[in-house]
């Protein structure tokens, strides 16, 4: 059976890891063992934070909507309840964008929500 020399394969594998570790600090960028650990950990962080990003943006949208509706005398929860009663099917991303960039349009939405709410539910604490 012929002898298999694996130098090219191993070198290619090492170079792929070192290319992924480009820009890292210290021995993490040029020592294969440490670079492999750093690249693996970076992948774990990337996977985790792709999930966290969705939660973070939703929280940001809620904060922006809450700030905008409190200026109009409502709370976030009452506003969302009023949206449902008014039959407006807008998600938080769109509402936050309207609140930040299109205040006139958001004001019209708030007026519709206030008219759809029962009388006792209009007061912000």
Swiss-Prot record:
Q: Which GO terms describe its molecular function?
A: rRNA binding; structural constituent of ribosome
Enumerate the InterPro entries for this protein: Ribosomal_bL20, RIBOSOMAL_L20_CS, Ribosomal_protein_bL20_C
| Keywords carried by this UniProt record | Ribonucleoprotein, Ribosomal protein, RNA-binding, rRNA-binding
Question: A GO biological process this protein is involved in?
Answer: ribosomal large subunit assembly
Single GO cellular component annotation?
A: ribonucleoprotein complex
- UniProt xrefs under Pfam families: Ribosomal_L20 (PF00453)
Q: Which family is this protein grouped under?
A: Belongs to the bacterial ribosomal protein bL20 family.
Q: Which HAMAP family match?
A: Ribosomal_bL20
Q: PANTHER family this protein is in?
A: 39S RIBOSOMAL PROTEIN L20
Q: Which NCBIfam families match?
A: rplT_bact
Annotated function: Binds directly to 23S ribosomal RNA and is necessary for the in vitro assembly process of the 50S ribosomal subunit. It is not involved in the protein synthesizing functions of that subunit.
Q: What is this protein called?
A: Large ribosomal subunit protein bL20
Identify the species of origin: Zymomonas mobilis subsp. mobilis (strain ATCC 31821 / ZM4 / CP4)
Gene from which the chain derives? rplT
